């Protein structure tokens, strides 16, 4: 059984027991969260597709950890003008473990 849901403007395909990295959520570590924006649920041959969301579809998950991703360097450069600029960015994320999928 697997499902597709959206969180943080992105879509994720998950199954029970899987750990997923999402955009930062303001929820404490160890708490549970329910995602109601379920786009599709598949259980073997039976597939439910939402328009846009599946009625009664809920994905339950537990927050495992928060953190920051690897640094991405942004470089701006103009040749022959002695102009160089560097900037770094580290995106916050939340790891969640899927505990249940229901339709």
From Swiss-Prot:
Keywords: Ribonucleoprotein, Ribosomal protein, RNA-binding, rRNA-binding. InterPro entries: bL21-like, bL21-like_sf, Ribosomal_bL21, Ribosomal_bL21_CS. Pfam families: Ribosomal_L21p. It comes from the Bacteria. The keyword NADP does not apply. GO terms for cellular component: cytoplasm; ribonucleoprotein complex; ribosome. GO terms for molecular function: rRNA binding; structural constituent of ribosome. Part of the 50S ribosomal subunit. Contacts protein L20. Belongs to the bacterial ribosomal protein bL21 family. This is Large ribosomal subunit protein bL21. It comes from Salmonella paratyphi A (strain AKU_12601). The gene is rplU.
């Amino acid at each position: 059984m697997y499902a597709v849901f959206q969180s943080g403007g992105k879509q994720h395909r998950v199954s029970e027991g899987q750990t997923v990295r999402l955009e930062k959520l303001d929820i404490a570590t160890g708490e549970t969260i329910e995602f109601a924006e379920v786009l599709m649920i598949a259980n073997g041959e039976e597939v439910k597709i939402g328009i846009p969301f599946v009625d009664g579809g809920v994905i339950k998950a537990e927050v495992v950890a928060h953190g920051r991703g690897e640094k991405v360097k942004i470089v701006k450069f103009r040749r022959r003008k002695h102009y160089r600029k560097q900037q770094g960015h580290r995106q916050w994320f939340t790891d969640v473990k899927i505990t249940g999928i229901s339709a």
